Amino acid sequence: SDIYTLETVVPPQSPYAYVPNSATNLPLHASASGKLLIAHMSPKEQKKLIENSDLQALTQYTITKKEELWNCIKEITRQGYAVELSELSVGIGSIAVPIFDLRGTLRATISLVGSTEMLRSNLNRMVAELQRAGERITNKISYPNTTLHKFQ
């Protein structure tokens, strides 16, 4: 069970060198977008996926215990966004928020990748900005010919 990177955008003067290639596959259990996708699956789908997954360690910080992943998914469901810090690559982390269709079904995620230090120190601001971007994209695909609607 993997997640694929479709597009990446890097500021021209970015001091960070981590740039995943488009179409890079990442394991669901170790990426913010992957965990967000799991959180939006039905309970039956979640159970099947988690119980049948080999939670392989990519770094010393990767979640490798199913109970720990379940707890993480519950927290993501509660807060509405996902964060991973150093689970794919030490020193690099990501924040992901959902993009929904008109019926409220998760269709995609949008994520921000940066140094774990930068993400930790700016988490609340970055989550808020990413959520605004996710809401705008959701509104554009759900209501393409209308003005923006605020999530409730």
Where are these regions (language model features)?
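Amphipathic alpha-helical effector-binding/dimerization core
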Residues: S1-N52
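Sparse recognition of residues in long alpha-helices and their boundaries
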Residues: S22, L119-R120, T146
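Generic alpha-helical structural context detector
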Residues: K35-A39, K74, E135, N139
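Short loop->beta-strand "edge-of-pocket" segments that line small-molecule binding or catalytic clefts
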Residues: I38, A57-L58
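Cysteine/selenocysteine-centered motifs that mediate thiol-based redox chemistry or coordinate metal-sulfur cofactors
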Residues: K48-L49, D54, N124, G134-Q152
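Intrinsically disordered, low-complexity polar/acidic regions
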Residues: L58-T59, V90
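Extended hydrophobic
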Residues: T64-R136, F151-Q152
